[in-house]
Amino acid sequence: MRHYEATEYILSFLLGDATPLDISGKIRISRHAQMQHSPDYVAYCRPEEAKPYHRVVIVPSGFFDYEQYGRAESMPTLPLAEWHGMPLLFGEPREESLETPYGTRLIIYADLVASSYFLLSRYEEMYYRKRRDEHGRFPGRESLAYRAGFLERPLVDEYAAELRRLMGEIGLAVQPMEPGFSSVALTHDLDQPYYSSGVRGFLRLLLKERLSLRAAYRNTFSRASEDLFFSYGRFLDWNVETQRKCASPVRTIFFIKTPSPHPLDKPNYTLRNHKIAAIMRLARRRKVEFGLHLNLYCSEHPDAVEAAKVELEKELGESVTCSRHHYLAVREPEDYNALLGAGIYHDYSMGYADVAGFRLGTSRPVRFINPQSLEVTDLILHPLTVMDYTLHDEKYMHLDYAEAERVALAMVEQAYKYHGEVTLLFHNENLLLDDPHIYHTRLYRALLRQIIKLSPAPDIVGL
C-alpha cells in the first residue's frame, strides 16, 4: 500500500514527538536514520483485520483508497462532525471497547490518521489548484480550517492529546503531552533592511518622498545605525534577554534575500552594502543564525532555489540549511522538493499571510509529506505562530492592538499547551520607536514576556 509510510508517520506523530532529534537547522536528520514506527499494539485497519495483540484500532474511512484519493469524494463536507469536542474530518465520531486475552481493545471509528494527514500534508492545496491569490498563494480564508472555524486550534495536537488520554484509560503507557515549548525561534526577514541606500535611494527620498536635501542625505549616506529602519540593536537585545530568561531553547534567525528580477523583491541588496555589512557585524556578535529568504522569483521558478542558496552561501561564507519564502509565497506543495534538492532541510514558511492560525493543524515541527506521492521527506516544516503584517495590514486581518494581542497570545499559549514550537516573525521596519500607527514594538515585547512567563528559567523573573 503506497500510503503505508505516510500513515505510519502520522501514527508516530500522534503518539510521540516524531520530530528530528536536532531542529537547529544545522544537521540533517534523515527519516530513515530516526526510527518512527507506531507501537505494535496500535493498528490502522478494519476491526476484522486486527491482530490479537492490537489494543488500539483506528478504522480507516476510505480516504486513502485508490478510487477516492485525489477525487471530490475525498474532500470533507461542512458541517463537520465532532469527536470529543473536536472537529472530525473523516470517519464516525464513536468508539467501542472489546475485551481480549491481551486486555481491552479500543476501536476508534474516528479516522484520526486521515484527518491529520489532510492538514499536515496541505492536501486541499493540491486538490484546489486554482484557488490562489495574486502571489500564487493558497489563501487562508479558503482553507477548510478557516471555513470550519478551527484555524486557531492546533487540531492535530488536540487529536494526539485525546488519543493518548483514551489509551491511558485502557492501561497503555503513552508519552503524555506535557506543557512547554520545544523551542522558540525569533525570526526576522530582511525585506527592507534599510530605509535608503545609494544614489537611487537618495533620489527617491528627494524627488518622490519630498524629503529635504539634508534629511535625504542623512537617511541615505549616514552611518547604518542612523537609518530609520535600523532597529536591530534594540530588538536583538530583547531576543538575547529572552534567551537568558527562558527555560526553553531560544534562537534568532535572520532570513536574507538574494537579488531578483521580480519587481516585488526590491530592494535588491548584497552583503557588501555598507549598511548590510553593519547589520551583519551586529548579528554575528549576537550569535544570530542565517537562513535563505527565497524571493518571489524563486517562488515562481523553483528550479532557481539552488542557485539562490549557493549565492547566499558564497556571500556568507557558511552553509545555509533553512529558508522562508518571501510573502510566505509557497505555491504548490510539491515545490518543496526544490528545497530538498538544494540541500535545505528546515523551512519556516508555514503560515497563511492573510489570517493567523495553524496552517498545518499543528504547533509542532513536522516532516513535509508530499500529497502527490504520499512520500514522507527529510524536510522539516516549522509552523509559523505569528507574523506582524498578518495582524495589522489592511489586506489581511487589519486588527487593532487589543485584538492583535489577543490573537497572538492565544497562538503562543496553544503552542505551549501541546509542547509545540513558537516561531515569531517580526520585521525590523515594524519594530521602530517613533512609528505610533503600527503597534508591533509593543506587541513583540508582550509576546516575549509571555514566553518567559510560561517557560521561565530557574530563579528568573519575567522582563
Language-model segments: what does each one mean?
Residues 285-286, 342, 418, 454:
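Structured helix-beta-strand junction loops
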Residues 293, 349-351, 425-429:
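Short acidic/histidine-rich active-site segments
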Residues 171, 291, 355-359, 420:
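Glycine-centered flexibility motif
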Residues 189-191, 293, 345-349:
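Conserved acidic functional residues
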